[in-house]
From Swiss-Prot:
Role, per record: A key translational regulator that binds mRNA to regulate translation initiation and/or mRNA stability. Mediates global changes in gene expression, shifting from rapid growth to stress survival by linking envelope stress, the stringent response and the catabolite repression systems. Usually binds in the 5'-UTR; binding at or near the Shine-Dalgarno sequence prevents ribosome-binding, repressing translation, binding elsewhere in the 5'-UTR can activate translation and/or stabilize the mRNA. Its function is antagonized by small RNA(s).
Signal peptide: none
Source species of the chain: Shewanella frigidimarina (strain NCIMB 400)
Protein name, UniProt field: Translational regulator CsrA
One GO CC term on file: cytosol
Intracellular or extracellular location(s): Cytoplasm
GO molecular function: mRNA 5'-UTR binding
One Gene Ontology biological process: negative regulation of translational initiation
Length: 65
């Protein structure tokens, strides 16, 4: 895993078309902004896992099934 340090307002690049910008830090929460082409899906991890479990027909942890 690559670990980077960024300050509020600073950006990192993923490939040529995806940028991640630190928008703010409040306590232990970090707000980030992601700019990516429409064909690139961007999800929080828990949402991505729910999507994957729904595709496979397996209930996700904490799901309402």
């Amino acid at each position: 895993m690559l670990i980077l340090t960024r300050r509020v307002g600073e950006t990192l690049m993923i490939g040529d078309e995806v940028t991640v910008t630190v928008l703010g830090v409040k306590g232990n929460q970090v707000r980030i902004g992601v700019n990516a082409p429409k064909e690139v899906s961007v999800h929080r991890e828990e949402i991505y896992q729910r999507i994957q479990s729904e595709k496979s027909g397996t209930p996700s942890e904490g799901g309402n099934y």
